Amino acid sequence: MAVLSKEYGFVLLTGAASFVMVLHLAINVGKARKKYKVEYPVMYSTDPENGHMFNCIQRAHQNTLEVYPPFLFFLTVGGVYHPRIASGLGLAWIIGRVLYAYGYYTGDPSKRYRGAVGSLALFALMGTTVCSAFQHLGWIRPGLGYGSRSCHH
């Protein structure tokens, strides 16, 4: 049986918070469907007047769903050896995705880059996963400090 550290609870809470964020974006798409009269299962609007706004709201949610599986994988695995770092990066990703979505919601897709911190956080989370793999394989050892062959310097 594997034993996770008590601090892994932060990772679990971050994962739950990410679901709340994804649900929030989904609710926004549902509201936009009603407002712009886009019925299921149509994914994108062709309405020349309001289609662009609906499509921006839909794309913000869809793009988040596209990166959600890697986010959850990196959070879950990277958090095994680095629960606090992974949780902090996970929160940065969540905030970045909200900034991304609300930038997109303006109707100006270039404003989605306000959420670039989320992409940086995702790459850093990938780093915690790689570091965890190296530690698990015994290629480096956990810990801080110079000369310890750790991920932290």
UniProtKB/Swiss-Prot annotation:
Signal peptide range in chain numbering: none
Q: Where is the lipid attached (S-palmitoyl cysteine)?
A: C151
Task: Quote a single Gene Ontology cellular component term.
Answer: mitochondrial outer membrane
Swiss-Prot/TrEMBL GO biological process terms: arachidonate metabolic process; leukotriene biosynthetic process; prostanoid metabolic process
The UniProt GO MF terms for this protein read: glutathione peroxidase activity; glutathione transferase activity; identical protein binding; leukotriene-C4 synthase activity
Q: EC?
A: 2.5.1.-, 1.11.1.-, 4.4.1.20
Its main localization is: mitochondrion
Residue ranges annotated as transmembrane are: 9-29, 71-91, 120-140
Q: Tell me the residue ranges located in the Mitochondrial intermembrane compartment per UniProt.
A: 1-8, 92-119
Compartment annotation: Mitochondrion outer membrane
- Give the record's keywords alphabetically: Lipid metabolism, Lipoprotein, Lyase, Membrane, Mitochondrion, Mitochondrion outer membrane, Oxidoreductase, Palmitate, Transferase, Transmembrane, Transmembrane helix
| Catalysed reactions, semicolon-separated | leukotriene C4 = leukotriene A4 + glutathione; 15-deoxy-Delta(12,14)-prostaglandin J2 + glutathione = 15-deoxy-Delta(12,14)-prostaglandin J2-S-(R)-glutathione; (5S)-hydroperoxy-(6E,8Z,11Z,14Z)-eicosatetraenoate + 2 glutathione = (5S)-hydroxy-(6E,8Z,11Z,14Z)-eicosatetraenoate + glutathione disulfide + H2O
Which InterPro entries does this entry report, sorted A to Z? MAPEG, MAPEG-like_dom_sf, Membr-assoc_MAPEG
Q: Report membrane topology.
A: Multi-pass membrane protein
Q: Does the keyword RNA-binding apply?
A: no
Q: In which pathway does it act?
A: Lipid metabolism; leukotriene C4 biosynthesis; Lipid metabolism; arachidonate metabolism
Q: Cytoplasmic compartment: which residues?
A: 30-70, 141-153
Q: Which PANTHER family match?
A: GLUTATHIONE S-TRANSFERASE 3, MITOCHONDRIAL, MICROSOMAL GLUTATHIONE S-TRANSFERASE
Similarity comment: Belongs to the MAPEG family.
Q: What does this chain do?
A: Displays both glutathione S-transferase and glutathione peroxidase activities toward oxyeicosanoids. Catalyzes the Michael addition reaction of reduced glutathione (GSH) to electrophilic eicosanoids to form GSH adducts, as part of detoxification or metabolic shunt processes. Mediates GSH conjugation to leukotriene A4 to form the sulfidopeptide leukotriene C4. Metabolizes cyclopentenone prostanoids, specifically mediates GSH addition at C9 within the cyclopentenone ring of 15-deoxy-Delta12,14-prostaglandin J2 (15dPGJ2) to form 15dPGJ2-glutathione. L-cysteine cannot substitute for GSH.
What is the name listed in the Swiss-Prot or TrEMBL entry for this protein? Answer: Glutathione S-transferase 3, mitochondrial
Supply the source organism's classification.
Answer: Eukaryota, Metazoa, Chordata, Craniata, Vertebrata
